A protein has these predicted regions:
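A conserved beta-strand->alpha-helix junction
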Residues: 1-16
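Short, well-ordered secondary-structure micro-motifs
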Residues: 15-16, 57-59, 151-153
């Protein structure tokens, strides 16, 4: 697959009086990915969200919005012919790091100065306290998101 890099000016899209945050920035990137995919006849977009991302998002939504929601492994849209897939949804961070090291991939770190406006670091810390980094416990949490027994919920 050919690598194409597209630079977008997310800051220029920010409305006056609004704060930059990870959610808004990522939605702008997904919008551009969607446009690119449709312009080139693609119907699937693979995103790099992994198990920890999904569980952190679930914790953030539960603890800030009182909502049980995360990021589904497959998200098909009705309004346009695109499906977002998350092929790394069952891989946690240590697994990805091990694989990257074995393959000799170059490591990169997010240096966005706006990441402090996100609750993800706190959610990551809470997830680590909850699971002690144990992959099996993370998988149980992931499975719980998919196996909701509403008869035993308020």
């Amino acid at each position: 697959i050919e690598l194409n890099i597209k630079t977008i000016s997310v800051l220029e899209r920010l409305k006056t009086g609004k704060k930059m945050n990870c959610w808004w920035c990522s939605s702008q990137r997904r919008l551009e990915l969607s446009k690119y995919a449709q312009e080139h006849g693609f119907n699937k977009i693979a995103l790099g969200h992994h198990l920890d991302d999904i569980l952190e998002t679930a914790l953030m939504n539960a603890l800030t919005k009182g909502e049980l929601a995360a990021m589904p492994p497959v998200l098909k849209f009705d309004k346009f012919p695109l499906t977002f897939i998350r092929p790394l949804c069952l891989a946690d961070i240590p697994m990805i790091i091990r694989h990257a090291e074995m393959q000799g991939y170059i490591s990169s770190t997010c240096t966005c100065s706006y990441q402090n406006n996100s609750g993800r670091k706190t959610a990551r810390s809470r997830l680590d306290k909850l699971t002690d980094g144990n992959y099996e416990l993370k998988r149980k949490l992931f499975d719980a998101l998919r196996n909701v027994n509403t008869a035993y919920l308020p």
